[in-house]
Amino acid sequence: MGGPDLGDPVTLSKIARPEEELEAVSGAEGLVPVAIGIEIGGTKLQSAVVAADGHVLLRRSDRVDPAGGAEGVRTVLAAQLAGIINDAAGNRLAIRAIGIGFGGPVNREQGVVSTSFHVGGWSDFPLAAWVAGQVRDSLGAVPVVLENDSNAATLGEALVGGGRGARVVVYSNAGSGIGSGLVIDGHLYRGRASGEMELGHLRLFPGGGILEDSSAGWAIDARVREAVAAEPAGMLAKEAAAATAPPSARLLPAALAAGDATAQQILDAAAGPYAHALSHVVHLLNPDVIVLGGGVATIGEPWRGSVARQLEGFLMTPLRPSPPVQLATLGEDVVPVGAALAALGDQSRAARRGEP
């Protein structure tokens, strides 16, 4: 289990929030009000203590084995929570709420996981209630908010990341899957039941595949492997021979920086359908900014530039120029930060309404 990362000294001056909202989550004098944000993915589990301005004060991270199922993940999570709560107490941080960003569809109102596409045993599990029970002895009855991880990431990037200051923010993350979310005036858009903004499941053409088939990380990995096999003397093949891991999209940044044409073709082939899907979002919503995150976005400016350039070509003339396309800025912290801010926001609103 990873130890705490204390970062900069914690002071109240780091919390830039309207006074009435700060009062709604404030505790004993001298304690800094914070939330725990949790990310539960297929292989990664991380928790962070987050201030109301999105500043990460403490973090812990563990790898989990999907073969262990949901029960195995919960065993690791219980230990991780105990550790980070202890870290927070030692740094005079008052935990006021907990937010969870879960990698799959959830029923937010009930705090229940609908299902997981990567780890068995999560279907219909009351995760929010389970977490509340795990921390009750150490924290008392703190509110626990459950979000889909894409929604949590969207809120984080909209409030304190690449979309900060914009009124309408669309965020999309491309990794093992493709998710997205929408924030309007600082509030997540929520559709019916347990899902909305499922960009990765758009069918670009009737009877065709979904966007993830073309633009998810695994689809790009497959194209890289094909290129390595087809061009044994090419730059990607040379990079693959020098690498310890199997060929994947991780080979692209160096090849792109060197001007390799094959790498650019692979990138454009993934960015094109992605831009096409985003053009539908722009035609429907015309947001102020589009923020790109996820593992694929770590390719950086070449990915952002290809998506932005191709997006422009898909838009009707009155909607050009397209909304700015930005890279996400919160990195690995995006889901915990967004989940924590969602939890703090819920608690402050409840306090102003006089709810417990």
Please state what every model-predicted region is.
Residues G2-A97, N107-V112, V131-V142, G156-A166, ...:
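ATP-binding/phosphotransfer module of carbohydrate and carboxylate kinases, centering on a glycine-rich
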Residues E39, G99-G103, E147, Y171-G177, ...:
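Short beta-strand segments
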Residues R60-D62, F117, R192:
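Short hydrophobic alpha-helix segments
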Residues G104, W122-A128:
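A structural motif shared across PLP-dependent enzymes of the aminotransferase-like
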Residues V112-S123:
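A charged helix-plus-loop insertion that forms the helical arch/lid used to bind
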Residues L146-A153:
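Glycine-rich oxoanion-binding loops at beta->alpha junctions
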Residues R164-W218:
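Glycine-rich phosphate-binding loop of actin/hexokinase-like ATP-binding domains
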